[in-house]
Amino acid sequence: MLKAYYNFVIDDLRNKILHRSIDLFNKEINPSRTVKNYDDFQNYINDDQLIDGAYKIGVIGWEAQKILKHAKETRHIFDGHPKSSDPSIIKVLDMFNDCIKYVLNEEYPSQIININEYIKILESSSFDRNKIAVTNAFGDLPEIYKNELIHRLFEIYIHPQTPSTLSSNIEFVSPMLWELLPKSTKINLVRKVDQEIIKGDSSITNKAFSFVKLVNATGYLSQSAREYKLSPLIEELKNNTYMWDIENRCVKELSDYAEIIPSNHIKDYVWAITHTYIGNIGHSYQYNRTDFYANIASSYIPSMFEKFNSEMIEAFIETIKTSEAIKRLVITPSKLRRLRNLALKIEDKLTNSSHENLLVTLIDEAKEKEFLQALK
């Protein structure tokens, strides 16, 4: 009787695993022979593998896993040997109740997406771009599936022959999947950027950086990856002051990395974005204005200043003190206001140290003369 009932429970467990995901079961258990159907369970999978696999893929919980292993031992003790004694009615009922509670009464688990099939769906223009649907599809995935899926999406996204529809759908789903990943998986994925840098294909490397920005993970970039990306941009920006198209492009790209500027580039970075924001004074036959600056770049720079650390504040003070261009420009009220706007963005981060007095004076409009005198 125990044997028949136990086999009935095992049958139910197999069917629930098949419903959940046989592919995931194989990945978690890694059996000697791949399980493809119900008969393969009988031929290649023992009870311990079945119970452990069911737990790992979310068919049963931790408590149920322990209870079922105890039920297996109970069955072996009392119904696995010709000389076994008969179990007490209490022992039988306890086993029945446990199996009913933890397996038979449990509803069939939700099905897990097949990664290969899901990627095929992403290739289609009919993919349902519904955030709730996507979140539900990802939320139930075990860690091993999430890890595999994010790496697959990354590899597909950076491939030069990936269709635009697939790229667009990857851009839609990846940030939602990223939020569900553990830190270790995020770090391992972002470090793939270093591997692409070494390979030397700039178009693929740029796509790798784009993916990292897409999932808001620039903070995980290695020091060498930051140097690779930011050093040329900072140098180009500094060397092309008042070249608006270049300033607009460089600042827009740098804005995504404002919190991770390498220390050895901070002085040049702060110098460049400060001068870009202040702009220049000139005349135009087309526009009735004398205050000129890169419009697009100027829309990004205030928020970049809000991410300043103490080293960047020091560089800002040094830029104001040493730049002859700024000393000349801030005599004009409009340029002084622009410089003050930048100082206001970091006002909350100022301390009472004496070397910051220059910024305190700059922020106070009543002390304009005192500030200008301090620059001489």
Could you say what each language-model-derived stretch is?
Residues 16, 34-39, 79, 100-107, ...:
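Eukaryote-specific, cytoplasm-facing alpha-helical/coiled-coil scaffolding segments in long proteins
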